[in-house]
């Protein structure tokens, strides 16, 4: 490992001890914001420090094994230890490189998840419902909280569009690669000839950030329309104009919210989603300006970018970005997404490492 990397790891090891001491100070404990920030930093540094300590120990073990080579009785055992030690060091160095990659500050935050039916009519809306259920099950398995912000029901089930806020640790970092086009191939329940239909949905994932970090929105840039909500809701539905539609005139971004009975609550929810969308658009524009020719696994941000196909007759799901195919569609639709998500995350990290190597 390069001396510069070792020096950086030693500095992080010192910072880990420093943060540990700070977390025990009464003034820090009394300041909840600072305590939370330091706790997050400590958790990240703990992983790096633990891995670095294992690497240091492995290096010492290698030196001990090399000294044993001079002893004829111990030589065979020493050679075996050196072989195993070399493999362990290589694995630890790879892990340390990943841990040292620049962190997206949004990764630890929650997110807004939008699922929208595309081409395919009723079948697309039904599939949008299936996708939302899949993500909800995944969130449940991770102990994340899902709050529906807005939902427009499909005529025969599912959703024309559904927006949810997912809260928990590391939500955005896990789900941000889900943005893009999702295609389904299956035989609809209404299909009497047994023909396979192709439908599509789009998914957008945006980081949920504190209000203070959202872009400033000039009220004069907004057009706010009220209308009567539709869908489930008992007697209250269609009796008051509680639903809200907000249009951000400079960008043309439109957000609707009709989930709450209170117009005020619907407006607050719609504004939070609007702020996240505007921020996501600004970040995407900046990334495009900074982007090199290297492929971007986060996609172009264009909803038409097809990232995944779900083929029900074959029980197959394919991620087109990394040419990964799994024959576990039933498990995936029940929310077991790690087998799909982790390879994309790892590929993204490999791309980051390659980009850093080119810069050096």
From Swiss-Prot:
This is Peptide chain release factor 1. Residues 284-293 have a biased composition (Basic and acidic residues). Keywords: Cytoplasm, Methylation, Protein biosynthesis. Residues 284-305 are annotated as: Disordered. Signal peptide: none annotated. It comes from Pectobacterium atrosepticum (strain SCRI 1043 / ATCC BAA-672). The keyword Manganese does not apply. Its main location: cytoplasm. Peptide chain release factor 1 directs the termination of translation in response to the peptide chain termination codons UAG and UAA. One of its GO terms (cellular component) is cytoplasm. GO terms for molecular function: translation release factor activity, codon specific. NCBIfam families: prfA, PRK00591.1. Belongs to the prokaryotic/mitochondrial release factor family. SMART domains: PCRF. It comes from the Bacteria. It holds the Pfam family PCRF. It is found in: Cytoplasm. PROSITE patterns: RF_PROK_I. The modification N5-methylglutamine is found at residue 235.
């Amino acid at each position: 490992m390069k001396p510069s990397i070792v020096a950086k790891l030693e500095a992080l090891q010192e910072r880990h001890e420093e943060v540990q001491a700070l977390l025990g100070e009464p003034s820090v404990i009394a300041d909840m914001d600072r305590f939370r920030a330091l706790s997050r930093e400590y958790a990240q540094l703990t992983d790096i420090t633990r891995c670095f300590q294992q690497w240091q120990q492995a290096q010492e073990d290698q030196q001990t094994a090399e000294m044993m080579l001079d002893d004829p009785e111990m030589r065979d055992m020493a050679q075996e230890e050196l072989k195993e030690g070399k493999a362990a060091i290589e694995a630890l160095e790879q892990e340390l490189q990943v841990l040292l990659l620049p962190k997206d500050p949004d990764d630890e935050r929650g997110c807004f998840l939008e699922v929208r039916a595309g081409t395919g009519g009723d079948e697309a809306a039904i599939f949008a419902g299936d996708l939302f259920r899949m993500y909800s099950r995944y969130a449940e398995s991770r102990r994340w909280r899902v709050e529906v912000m807005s939902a427009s029901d499909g005529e025969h089930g599912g959703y024309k569009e559904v927006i949810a806020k997912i809260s928990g640790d590391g939500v955005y970092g896990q789900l941000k690669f889900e943005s893009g086009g999702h295609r389904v191939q299956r035989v609809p329940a209404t299909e009497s000839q047994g023909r396979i239909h192709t439908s599509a949905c789009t998914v957008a994932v945006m980081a949920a950030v504190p209000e203070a970090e959202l872009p400033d929105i000039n009220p004069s840039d907004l057009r706010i329309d009220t209308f009567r909500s539709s869908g489930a809701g008992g007697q209250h539905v269609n009796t008051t104009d509680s639903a809200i539609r907000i249009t951000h005139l400079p960008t043309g971004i439109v957000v609707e919210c009709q989930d709450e009975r209170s117009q005020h609550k619907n407006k607050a929810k719609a504004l939070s989603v609007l702020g996240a969308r505007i921020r996501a658009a600004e970040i995407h524009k900046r990334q495009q300006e900074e982007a090199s020719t290297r492929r971007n696994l986060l996609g172009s941000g264009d909803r038409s970018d097809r990232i995944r196909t779900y083929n029900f007759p074959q029980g197959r799901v394919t991620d087109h970005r990394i040419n990964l195919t799994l024959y576990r569609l039933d498990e995936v639709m029940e929310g077991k997404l790690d087998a799909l998500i982790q390879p994309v995350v790892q590929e993204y990290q490999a791309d980051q490492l390659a980009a850093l190597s080119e810069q050096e």
